Amino acid sequence: MNGSADAGPRPRKYVFITGGVVSSLGKGILTSSLGALLRARGYRVTAIKIDPYVNVDAGTMRPYEHGEVFVTADGAETDLDIGHYERFLDMDLSRGNNLTTGQVYLSVIQKERRGEYLSQTVQVIPHITDEIKERIRKVAEEQKAEIVVVEVGGTVGDIESLPFLEAIRQFRFDEGEGNTLYLHLTLVPYLETSEEFKTKPTQHSVATLRGVGIQPDILVLRSARPVPEEVRRKVALFTNVRPGHVFSSPTVEHLYEVPLLLEEQGLGRAVERALGLEAVIPNLAFWQEAVRVLKHPERTVKIAIAGKYVKMPDAYLSLLEALRHAGIKNRARVEVKWVDAESLEAADLDEAFRDVSGILVPGGFGVRGIEGKVRAAQYARERKIPYLGICLGLQIAVIEFARNVAGLKGANSTEFDPYTPHPVIDLMPEQLEVEGLGGTMRLGDWPMRIKPGTLLHRLYGKEEVLERHRHRYEVNPLYVDGLERAGLVVSATTPGMRGRGAGLVEAIELKDHPFFLGLQSHPEFKSRPMRPSPPFVGFVEAALAYQERA
């Protein structure tokens, strides 16, 4: 940590973030923002998300229920908050950064079956709580973190959270008061009728937290508007928290305002003080510039996302953030027009895409809306509108090209039509013997070898890159030569897969189009505010150019 070189190693610091009153207050953004403030002070920080559900991971959950499944470099299917952490901290995390009840109990049961508990009666305390603490410490050690920020999902009072709350309570006993900090995020509703903030729910939430042995050191009050100083003093008095340790987190227009807002109030210094750290002035220049561009863009461009889960934007969270990052890079605001892919099957496409300058088809599964996505890809190809296809979006582009350019009538994916006469998209051979769904796809970072002279090579500026993946199907290698003869450009492959010379098709594009790109990977998972994804930067740049021409 910061300090003199001869001071010796300092103990690791742990910050635990809990939530009260209601769920979905934004603990993930608070965790990410605090991590960003600490990183801006020069500390090595990591963040861990605890999800109290019994699922082992988020991989098999419905997007409408849980939002996006975020994939880490090591192939873990995790909660979408892990994506927030990676973006705000500008670092790759791992499967250990997302801890679930399912993982903990599965591990403890397996240890008991192996006889590791030496005939003990296995109980929540100490065996489950010890497993939780061990996993948190393991991540901290592996990632050489000086400060570990741990978000406990759910709401204080939920029965599922109790073992985790007990585990984090024990951390103070194990590590000492100066090395642990409890931060509680809670709702302070504002009643329009009486024009007042109501603090009673927060008082009850803190009382519930105290009931499990945790006295919060810092409170962050979520509200639709800034919570005034006199209300914060009242909350401090009735919750036994220092007055200077109660902060306001009002609703803001842009997520990247949150770190700046909290720093302005002194949250970073309060955390330093509580953990016995020296005061450091953070370097927040990037965040300040990003917010300035978001609030005062030089241009605005509208992108259509033709997807399946358009009523649940969180299902495409990293995609939206990647577009935002690309907008910042291009000093532009990116507006999204949500288009239900199923509606495109019979829609007037001129009307559906009337006011957009780019069409994006995201990843997804299942047959619903597929033909609408195919029509969207055809419209983009024929009208020379910038097109970006992600994962399934690449496969859609190949299906459309095969049918309408290569003359392969009825071409399709075997995922949607097992009896198609031309299976231009087929199940990967490695997937034929796979049983079960959880964690069985081609996941995580895989290399892409990029062909020189292509659009993709111009975007990345290099011949090999790593991108995240999450798929079971691929472009059928038996059709690649024919598609290339018809004019499709295979601009990237994964080298050496299954011993084939050509490798798995990773990217396709068109020569006679200003920007038509399909990627089998999910580059949005690696896009960061400070390091935006090259395909997204190029896509937004092309959309801006199209808008100017139009």
UniProtKB/Swiss-Prot annotation:
What domain of life does the UniProt record list for this protein's source? Bacteria
| PROSITE patterns (UniProt xref) | GATASE_TYPE_1 (PS51273)
Reactions catalysed according to its record: UTP + L-glutamine + ATP + H2O = CTP + L-glutamate + ADP + phosphate + 2 H(+); L-glutamine + H2O = L-glutamate + NH4(+); UTP + NH4(+) + ATP = CTP + ADP + phosphate + 2 H(+)
Q: Tell me the SUPFAM superfamilies matching this sequence.
A: Class I glutamine amidotransferase-like, P-loop containing nucleoside triphosphate hydrolases
- Start and end residues of each stretch annotated as Amidoligase domain: 1-277
Q: Does the keyword Metal-binding apply?
A: yes
- Pathway it works in: Pyrimidine metabolism; CTP biosynthesis via de novo pathway; CTP from UDP: step 2/2
What biological-process GO terms show up in the record?
'de novo' CTP biosynthetic process; pyrimidine nucleobase biosynthetic process
Q: Where does CTP bind?
A: S23, D158, I159, E160, K198, T199, K200, P201, T202, Q203, K234
- Under Enzyme Commission nomenclature, its number is 6.3.4.2
Q: Which residues bind Mg(2+)?
A: D81, E151
Task: Outline the extent of the Glutamine amidotransferase type-1 domain.
Answer: 302-549
Pull one GO CC term from this UniProt entry. Answer: cytosol
| Keywords noted in UniProt | ATP-binding, Glutamine amidotransferase, Ligase, Magnesium, Metal-binding, Nucleotide-binding, Pyrimidine biosynthesis
Pfam families documented for this protein: CTP_synth_N (PF06418), GATase (PF00117)
What activates or inhibits this protein? Allosterically activated by GTP, when glutamine is the substrate; GTP has no effect on the reaction when ammonia is the substrate. The allosteric effector GTP functions by stabilizing the protein conformation that binds the tetrahedral intermediate(s) formed during glutamine hydrolysis. Inhibited by the product CTP, via allosteric rather than competitive inhibition.
Positions that bind ATP: S24, L25, G26, K27, G28, I29, D81
Active site at C391 (nucleophile), H522, E524
Q: Which GO terms describe its molecular function?
A: ATP binding; CTP synthase activity; glutaminase activity; identical protein binding; metal ion binding
Provide the binding site for L-glutamine.
Answer: Y64, G364, L392, G393, L394, Q395, E415, R472
Per UniProt, UTP binds at: S23, K198, T199, K200, P201, T202, Q203, K234
Annotated family:
Belongs to the CTP synthase family.
What more is known? CTPSs have evolved a hybrid strategy for distinguishing between UTP and CTP. The overlapping regions of the product feedback inhibitory and substrate sites recognize a common feature in both compounds, the triphosphate moiety. To differentiate isosteric substrate and product pyrimidine rings, an additional pocket far from the expected kinase/ligase catalytic site, specifically recognizes the cytosine and ribose portions of the product inhibitor.
Q: Which NCBIfam families match?
A: PRK05380.1 (NF003792), PyrG (TIGR00337)
Subunit organization: Homotetramer.
User: Protein name, please?
Assistant: CTP synthase
